[in-house]
Regions:
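Periplasmic c-type cytochrome electron-transfer domains
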Residues: 72-84, 90-92, 176, 192, ...
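N-terminal secretory signal peptides that target proteins for export/translocation
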Residues: 1-10
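Predominantly soluble domains enriched in secretory-pathway, periplasmic, or organellar proteins
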Residues: 31-36, 97, 119, 155-553, ...
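Short microdomains enriched in Cys/His and/or Lys/Arg
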Residues: 103-124, 162-181, 270, 586-602, ...
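Extracytoplasmic c-type cytochrome modules immediately beyond a signal peptide or single-pass transmembrane anchor
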Residues: 26-170, 516-532
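Bacterial N-terminal signal peptides
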Residues: 12-28
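Long, charge-rich boundary regions
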Residues: 123-146, 152, 181, 605-620, ...
């Protein structure tokens, strides 16, 4: 339900949508950072609005309340959108049970104010964007007035931030220092944890500060911070404990650390975006899962020389060695490519460590994202954290449950055939399970749930009883039985923002949980199932707009019963590799392929039909109404979310590395991309050249075209020119995901040459074109 701020009685000014003030703060270049509480926020005291002064453009007789409302809702770059003013009125229900539109604010003062403010901001922007603001963000009311109720001259950002006190979710009340939206703040962002074999040291992999912090396991004092490569993701110890391995995803390297000297002794090249890393028990081989190249690199553990690559599933990321060391299990964050509009399917790739060959592929039907895997000490139970989307039906009626089922798949001698069980409860979801740990005595399974910001605790004997006491479904899954978890989930322990990796101490009495977006480690007493202490990692205490936006992106607290958040569909801020039918476009209409979020800035409008002009429109009331079905963002939370998304960087392009020349195939592909005549000498119209629609640094001219790919269930034929940023990674393709490969865009879905002139190209020439596209 849209939030609206009512104007003073009798004024006829607009009821405003929740996105309005947020947009003003986004485009102002600085934002104050309130933190969303995990509990229901109490109704604030009514605000008072001082009489405005220095009204040079607005009507002179406006009250403070009226000026405040106008400033909130006006943003020139949005243009004149009907629903900015004419919102649904919940107090005025029509004959079919739907709220009528509110036309009470269609008044002369409002129109006069809008015209004046549009003219003013348009004049300012002509010079401001060209000479002052390199970010390309337009000026709005909030640029100068920065949240003040009185009209006054612009104040520099350093002096304009207002002191605020907010309550951090699950934490204490404290003042939050302000940071400008674009400030780079060096947070730690702990991602994975690991104890040394003797239990005396705790290794903390910090993704944002790009280091391993070595803590004394008794006092938690820092022994040393060890710098590693860019955006580290995986960490593991050699069997002897004398070497620590860290994967660096943006460098495609592996850092080797001597645990005696705590120094990096070697850096070895591996595959594209290395994630998990494990050394086998013999010390002969290192295995590295590469998320982008979808394979596992096998290295000589002594020299780092690569011996072979083993084909894995899509998005190979996390590794777990069986307790006997004979098998290595690989999980994948993206589903394998499948026929259009079929249920997703991932896999667990099983590798024989002695021979370094793929032994088996365990299918995970209906599963999209798969994360950590763990074994009991005796090897008789294997557990993997995953989630199971229901994407073949319209994403509607979230209150009925089951659109993202958070599950575990169990296998092993104690389980029998693999079986999927849900973690969700009837009124509380265990959103996005990530880390898994099993107690040494096999009595408990612990799962970190990123979106729910909690650790779920499972009683293993009760779980096994549940599995064996019931007839097994033919599908091998109890995923949609929301009553099932009551049989084995015994605790849900609140922790910090975005809990990820965790580890038990040697006795199993303490569970350490890395809270990535809070720079803390929660220490859970496993006997009482409560947080006994919290380690606060050294680093900045400022909560920047980007940091708060990232917290908002990864939490599921806004979704009905905590079911979903942004990161459900955009895994690690990217995409999920599946297609959806979203309710706003109509049931069964406009099937859409999920887009990559990185590098979005400068590619607006959004949606495949170009229906949303900017990120606040994309992520504001529309998202709250159709996806969350519950709590709304406050104005500044929406602002910070948009700031975070707009500032997501693009990862290194493996097909066009800095300092490298194009390959001959890429050069030939570029010539095809920019050509203006076909192979028969016929001119290609400007509108049918690749380089016209896909121009500019992001590979889009941001316009709508009919490229002949629409389907009977689409609401229109015009589609926005898709950006080419990271196109090599984002299969499937086209607006509805019907093309599984780049080649299919032209070989299957371009019979009339409406999507570029390509039917004169040979197979080899299409390959050249694709090689060039991958460089974008």
């Amino acid at each position: 339900m849209s939030r609206r701020i009512q104007t003073a009685a009798g004024t006829g000014l607009a009821a405003v949508a929740v996105t309005s003030l947020a947009v003003a703060f986004i485009l102002a270049g600085s934002a104050q950072v309130p933190q969303a509480s995990q509990n229901t926020v109490p109704t604030p005291e009514p605000r008072t609005f001082p009489a405005p002064t220095n009204l040079n453009v607005l009507p002179k007789n406006l009250t403070g309340q009226q000026v405040h409302n106008i400033m909130e809702q006006w943003e020139a770059s949005l243009g004149a959108q009907c629903n900015s003013c004419h919102t649904e009125d919940p107090n005025n229900i029509g004959p079919k049970g739907r709220p009528r539109l509110n036309f009470a604010d269609d008044s002369k003062p409002m129109k006069a104010a809008a015209r004046a403010m549009y003219s003013m901001t348009e004049r300012i922007n002509k010079d401001y964007l060209a000479k002052i603001n390199s970010s390309g963000d337009p000026v709005t009311c909030g640029t100068c007035h920065r949240g003040s109720l009185n009209i006054k001259p612009f104040v520099p950002p350093s002096d304009a931030a207002l002191p605020i006190t907010q309550k951090l979710p699950g934490s204490r009340e404290q003042p939050l220092p302000q940071a400008n939206a674009g400030d780079a703040v060096d947070y730690a962002s702990p991602l994975e944890l690991l104890f040394s074999p003797d239990g005396l040291r705790l290794y903390v992999l910090c993704q944002q500060s790009e280091e391993v912090r070595v803590l004394n396991a008794a006092t938690y004092a820092v022994i040393k911070n060890i710098a590693v490569g860019r955006v580290p993701r995986g960490i593991s110890l050699s069997p002897s404990g004398d070497r620590l391995f860290v994967t660096n995803t943006w460098d495609d390297t592996l850092s080797v650390i001597d645990t005696r000297t705590l120094a990096v002794t070697a850096t070895w090249p591996v595959g594209a975006e290395p994630s998990g890393v494990v050394e086998d028990r013999t010390g002969k081989h290192l295995f590295v899962a590469n998320r982008i190249s979808n394979d596992v690199a096998v290295l000589d553990a002594a020299t780092g020389e690569e011996e072979k690559r083993l084909l894995a599933g899509r998005g190979a990321s996390y590794l777990a060695l069986s307790p006997d060391g004979n098998k290595l299990y690989v999980t994948h964050v993206y589903p394998n490519l499948s026929p259009h509009r079929t249920a997703p399917e991932s896999e667990i790739t099983v590798i024989d460590t002695a021979r370094a060959v793929v032994l088996d592929r365990m299918p995970l039907h209906g599963v999209a994202g798969v994360f950590h895997l763990a074994f009991s000490a005796d090897g008789r139970i294997g557990v993997v954290a995953e989630y199971h989307p229901k994407n073949l039906v319209p994403l509607a009626h979230l209150e009925h449950g089951g659109y993202f089922v958070d599950t575990l798949t169990l296998f092993g001698a104690d389980v029998g055939k693999p079986i999927e069980v849900p973690l969700d409860e009837l009124e509380r979801y265990a959103s996005r399970p990530f880390g898994v740990a099993i107690a040494p005595d096999k009595s408990r399974i612990y799962i970190t749930c990123e979106g729910s910001e909690m650790v779920t605790v499972i009683d293993v004997p009760r779980l096994l009883h549940f599995i064996h006491a019931r007839p097994r479904p033919a599908s091998g899954s109890f995923a949609y039985d929301l009553a099932a978890s009551a049989n084995y989930v015994i605790a849900s322990i609140p922790v910090g923002h975005d809990p990820r990796g965790m580890t038990l101490n040697r006795s199993g009495s303490k569970l350490f949980v890395a809270n990535r977006l809070e720079d803390t480690i929660s220490i859970i007493d496993t006997r009482s199932n409560r947080v006994a202490a919290t380690i606060v990692l050294a680093g900045p205490k400022t909560v920047s707009a980007i940091r708060h936006g990232e917290q908002t992106f990864y939490t599921s607290r806004y979704g009905f019963q905590g079911q979903i958040g942004c990161a459900n569909c955009h895994i690690d801020s990217t995409f999920d590799g599946i297609t959806w039918n979203l309710e706003p476009d109509g049931f069964g209409r406009n099937i859409v392929d999920n887009k990559m979020l990185e590098g979005l800035k400068g590619t607006e409008p959004y949606k495949w039909n170009g229906g949303n002009p900017n990120i606040p429109t994309e992520c504001g009331p529309r998202t709250e109404k159709y996806f969350w079905r519950s709590e709304q963002y406050d104005d500044l939370t929406l602002a910070d979310l948009a700031i975070y998304i707009r500032n997501l960087p693009t990862r290194p392009n493996r097909w066009k590395m800095p300092g490298r020349e194009m390959t001959p195939a890429q050069e030939r592909g570029q010539a095809l991309f920019t050509r203006d005549t076909d192979k028969f000498g016929k001119p290609i119209s400007e509108y049918n050249r690749c380089s016209y629609c896909h121009s500019g640094p992001k590979g889009t001219n941001q316009k709508l075209f009919d490229v002949g790919t629409h389907k009977p269930n689409d609401n229109g034929t015009l589609l926005k020119s898709a950006p080419l940023t990271e196109i090599a990674l984002t299969a499937p393709y086209l607006h509805d995901g019907s093309a599984r490969t780049l080649e299919e865009i032209w070989t299957v879905y371009n019979p009339e040459d409406k999507h570029g002139r390509t039917n004169d190209l040979t197979k080899d020439e299409l390959n050249d074109l694709i090689e060039y596209l991958r460089t974008r």
